[in-house]
Amino acid sequence: MKRGQGPTIRRRRLASELRRLREAADLTIDEVGEKLECSASKVSRIETGHVGVTPRDARDMLELYGLTGDEREALVQLAREARKPGWWHAYKEVFTGTFVGLEADASSLRAFQALLVPGLLQTETYARAVIRAMRPDADESDIQRRVAARTARQELLVDPNPPQYWAVIDEAVLHREVGGPEVMAKQTNRLLELAQLTHVTIQVVPFAAGAHPGMEGPFLVLGFPEPADPDVVYVDSTSGGFFLELPPDVRRYTLMFDHLRAAALKPDDSLDVIATAAERYSR
């Protein structure tokens, strides 16, 4: 799939353009809501990309902002395309479309994990053990559904046009026995296999590195192919995670990732550490 052409990134792009045009028209969110007979909160949610916008609403807003002709119709068409369901809609009860949609459109993904193997790199048995541990009240059908959703996400790495994926993990990830030795043996070997892909890089931050920026928690920096689509950061948490889009926040996490890469072992040395773990679990 061509990166940056999915419905989520189109919605984000349209939201940014609607906000820019409103500001250029010297209108406040409250004034737009009053003129279009809708709530100011609806306008705000549209501009932040938290909700989609119908082609009719987009046309009404664009007319109010003074945009006409082909330029207006191009943005109305963008609104239509942004409403098309992505593959992840089949798993809407598992994860938010915004996260998976942006992940699917990204041209680069920079992930840090201190406790677990990143989701895109997990084997099915490792994912099952993680989900079962983190959701002790889930029944087997719910667990299976979540495993299937995670497996579907992983198709991204074998796409004909995959994103550049760079994962930095703490050495503790290799020592935390999730699911037992057999599960860990398969998981560590899976990491070695994926690291052979030209678009995948895996590094390990050794215990000897001491304190590091990633101690704050796991995060993902998503980059996109078009200059009009700025980078965004996803900070993971048990309550569902959240996005950071303000430039200072994105710069901070980008710098954190750069420091983590520097603190980590070189990719080849990291694979040696992973191979040692794989051998240990295979005994």
Locate each region found by the language model:
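Interdomain hinge/linker segments and adjacent boundary elements that couple functional modules
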Residues: 2-16, 20, 24, 30-34, ...
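The short coil/loop that forms the "turn" connecting the two helices of the helix-turn-helix
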Residues: 27, 38-39
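Positions that flank functional sites
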Residues: 37, 77, 210
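Short acidic (Asp/Glu) and glycine-rich catalytic loops that position anionic groups and cofactors
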Residues: 37, 54-58, 232-236
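Tryptophan-centered motif/residue detector
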Residues: 38, 87-88, 219
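C-terminal regulatory/effector modules of DNA-binding transcriptional regulators
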Residues: 180-283
